[in-house]
Amino acid sequence: MLVRAPRLVIAGLAGDSGKTLLAAGLARLLTSRGLAVAPYKKGPDYIDAGWLGAAARRPGRNLDTFLMTPAAIGEGLARGGRADLALVEGNRGLYDGLDAQGTHSTAELAKLVHAPVVLVVDVTKATRTVAAMILGCRAMDGAVDLAGVVLNRVGSARHERVVREAVAGAGGPPVLGAIPRLGCDPFPGRHLGLLTAAEHPERELALEQAAEIVARHVDVEALIALARSAPEAAFPDRAPVAPVAPAKIAVLRDEALSFYYPENLEALEEAGAELTFVSPLAARELPEVDAVYIGGGFPEVHAERLAAGAAFRRDLREAAAAGLPVYAECGGLMYLGKELLTGGASHPMAGILDLTIEQTAGPRGHGYVSARVEAENPWFERGTALRGHEFHYSRVVGGGDRSGAVLRLDRGTGLGEGRDGIAVGNVWASYLHLHALGTPGWAPAVVALAGAGRNGISGRATVSGRAR
């Protein structure tokens, strides 16, 4: 597979350096000029990808070398569709990865996709030292095409001039912009990162402000020229996935549960599923479907409203008890439990699983996960290796269904004590988020199980072997 679209990676020295401001602002600015921008987030983060998608007015996608093979990365780029520019926002610092060698870093991804890198540098209370940091990044790996720099949080015109002169005098890459300190951040955050684009009350205003900042303070034409300088990138071809069976799957999606990779939904459809979207905050009953898919999100923020939907919770609980396949991740796990403890109050949830889940002040699980299936279940064959990620501020504090965990974690927190993945009947619930490009057998297995139930067959999944 050959990828020819212009490509650009926006990286930083660290988290909170200003990458999202530049990437989202640039995506919105170019989109408003009539260019088609395919936005990507390096890593598994849903929220940043959502903002990039909102900025570009098309789905924001993820690229991750831990979750995906090079062939899957190529397919991920191809799934962005025909575009005038593929824009990748990095995560953390340019060389920060899984270990001291920077494995699975933004730099590694930039080399794989053959894209020039623009480094966003927070220059707060620094001048010539900025040049040293930039040159250090360039010297760290000569195979990384560090092609330009954008200064962020510049204090004054003099500050900008001194930093520019220091970088140029040291032989650094061109400085392509200087964003001043802002009175307020257009992208506010909360415990899992940014406020989601779907929930931001003034999302469009925030994106237009970001676009205006980029237009005013960054050499946009130079960034476009860099993207167009990216050479063709060759990737191995992936085997196509044939449709499994017709099935109707309900996806529970609204403000409470909004974390779904576009590729996961597309993979389900390609495997034969017809998707119908249902809001657990608004619906009173579950439509006639063959399975339910529940992603992550912020059920703790909307716990009172979820609890108020007693009729829908009862309908879902009765359907699961009758054997309806239900697949849930993270926030979905929390919703399937008996009760959710948050803010000093207890809120009844769906009650499909005997679990009491408590919202915590700090993260209980955050990062990549490596797991292996150790027990029989309808979803994954025993011995299957899975790779995904977790990010949750909650823990299971009670309930008998904890003993039904079928995943052994080689990396990650999950339910605790090295376990995750509760399988009860045809219900699967875990803190583990899977990406369809990293686990290509997942979608066919979900659709097969759903289709088997439709036809009155005792279905079993077909996910087996290694996830990658």
Regions found by a protein language model. Give the residues of each.
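ATP-dependent carboxylate-amine ligase catalytic core
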Residues: 2-113, 117, 121-148, 157-161
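Residues that mark the start of a beta-strand
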Residues: 7, 35-36, 246-248, 274, ...
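Structural motif
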Residues: 9, 87-89, 118, 150, ...
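Beta-strand->loop->alpha-helix junctions that form or flank phosphate-binding loops
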Residues: 41-42, 173-183, 274-281
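C-terminal and late-domain segments of enzyme folds
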Residues: 110, 243-245, 257-267, 274-275, ...
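Internal gly/pro-rich beta-alpha loop/helix module
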Residues: 127-241
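Phosphate-binding active sites in nucleotide-utilizing proteins
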Residues: 247-321
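Cysteine-nucleophile active-site neighborhood
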Residues: 299-379
